[in-house]
């Protein structure tokens, strides 16, 4: 199978959904990732996805590929990227994949990957493409069996861990603009647990990003938050 070379970046895999990043391509990447995991003696990979519209379907395609290699999958559902890394530690898998478009436009999505505690980058990411192109893929059979899939809600443990580590010197009143990105699913609950009074802006998760793009490095995306603070 030929995979677009340009989607394999230095620190992640990233492409345009339906063009350079399709469910079929992601499934093949999943099988390559599962094969690499087995070579590293890893048996289970956590998967999460952000609020982009393509997230659930790409996460399921990724899971199919990983399980085809004989590796188990724990689906975390809609989560922020740090929650996948936390789950890999908390659940003892040492492996996780976040399906996320990061700061890119809505028609993009991608994969950030950790195997055996290593964040994949550079040559290791390129080796996944090489596995697919050369057919160096493990495939489950009647003897080994396909990997199993389960689901786990990591949110409560994630929030509890942060609350146990962070103590505010005094209560705070804060405004949070999530730009309709995935943090909106958890921000209020987390900050209130820390003792904050929270004013929410655009915290409904919506992959269309109807208000502004969830990229705070662009100055105009901070306009609504600045207005809220002034008021």
Roles of regions detected by a PLM:
Residues 1-64, 68-69, 151-172:
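An N-terminal, well-structured beta->alpha segment
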Residues 39, 44-108, 189-231:
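N-terminal small/polar loop signature for handling phosphorylated ligands or for N-terminal nucleophile
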Residues 14-17, 50, 79, 98, ...:
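Gly/Ser/Thr-rich beta-alpha loop segments that engage phosphate groups in nucleotides
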Residues 109-231:
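Gly/Ser/Thr-enriched, mixed-charge loops and adjacent short helices
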